[in-house]
Amino acid sequence: MKPVFRNVLAGAVLVAVGAVAGPWIYINLVKQDAPEALTLEPAVTTTVAEAVAESVVETSVEAVAEVSAVDGQWVVAAESVVGYRAKEVIVAQKTEGVGRTSAVTGVLTIADEQVTGAEFTVDMTTLKSDSSRRDRQVNTRILDTATYPTATFVMNEPIELTAEALAGSDFTATVTGTLTLRGVTKDIDVTLIARLIGDVIEVNGSIELVFAEWSIPDPSLPGIVVEDRGQLEFLLRFTR
């Protein structure tokens, strides 16, 4: 084999190896793992909570006091988090893109053992991931946050609160509401888990988004393939 041809072949092999090894090294040795999905912290069971739950079920005088104490408006707290999660493949290496923000505002209203209203707004311009390149794509081509800077959700139907929920147990419900994202408005059903802990209400869940249904263009780029859907995750904390 002639030296010139051998050098060209060796160079081509190095380029090919680099194209495969580079993403593997980045994803497995350099890139931080995607954060875990947003979830409620494990509940702590106490005899006090059990006693309160029993009193609520029995509709005692103490139970009435507990129920009336939660009535009113609850406001989204600063530590609330909303974000996206999408599966990516970078040159045959699987990973996840995750971006989050705490720029969330909203209120939740409780009256007569029902959640009678809830809405929140997210400042989509503040979403941040572990990649500035991804953030630029999200803010421009993908979500066009200059044109659509916020996303909103408004609950459309009340939710009945069980005695256990009022006593502090985890409460699962399907909520019907209206989501507006990237200029598209749709009625959706969201399954969530909620918990009342003292003067804090926590609400956790996720919404599957098929990108085409929300006028979101294919997020893929040369060398990066993104699935055609992702998750809109949220962990909201409401306080007085």
Identify the role of each PLM range.
Residues 2-240:
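Low-complexity, acidic/polar, glycine-enriched regions of mature
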